[in-house]
Amino acid sequence: MRNPVDTAMALVPMVVEQTNRGERSYDIYSRLLKERIIFLTGAVEDHMATLVCAQLLFLEAENPKKEIALYINSPGGVVTAGMAIYDTMQFIKPAVSTLCIGQAASMGSLLLAAGHKDMRFATPNSRIMVHQPSGGFQGQASDIERHARDILKMKRRLNEVYVKHTGRTYEEVEKTLDRDHFMDADEAQGWGVIDKVLTSRLEMEGEQA
């Protein structure tokens, strides 16, 4: 049985645009990319991260001074894939605004928080969840020990990223992320993951004017 998310993504609408050279058709995501809008949807994994990073780099090459909008609806996923997106967001010249629509959980919440200061938003019914990384490994005791040390190092690094972008102390972040911690949009604003809850595009445009 096919994954329903894969099925939905395969049914991508096409839009038709009139140009000087006649009609041009785009899939909806390519058309939105022309407007410097990137969608980060579904589980964060290597293939998806590669596509998001490529779009960020392409838009930087097109115009290094113009803002990029990243729309997030993700349950999280692989830490290394998410950190590839995070590092690219910090690396490129354009400011990247983030907007949560639906949910931003786990790695999705970190990417939401990583947007440019005062340009991190969520819609009123969004759900944000933060927690520490998880993993499992089987093998020799010495290998398990090495993997345990690595995941603890990863935990410290992720905590430091949240500290940088939320303004919380390391101790506050570590305590909050100890277990799954769910927040609505207002709570996420209070905790520092986002800067504002948006109910209309006019509010977003006002913030960025």
Curated annotation (Swiss-Prot):
- The kind of enzyme this is, by top-level EC class, is hydrolase
Q: Which Pfam families match?
A: CLP_protease (PF00574)
Output the Gene3D superfamilies linked to this UniProt entry.
Answer: 2-enoyl-CoA Hydratase, Chain A, domain 1
One Gene Ontology term from the biological process aspect of the record: protein quality control for misfolded or incompletely synthesized proteins
Q: Which family does it belong to?
A: Belongs to the peptidase S14 family.
Subunit and partners: Fourteen ClpP subunits assemble into 2 heptameric rings which stack back to back to give a disk-like structure with a central cavity, resembling the structure of eukaryotic proteasomes.
Stated name of the protein:
ATP-dependent Clp protease proteolytic subunit 2
From which source organism is this entry?
A: Rhizobium etli (strain ATCC 51251 / DSM 11541 / JCM 21823 / NBRC 15573 / CFN 42)
The opening ranks of the lineage are: Bacteria, Pseudomonadati, Pseudomonadota, Alphaproteobacteria, Hyphomicrobiales
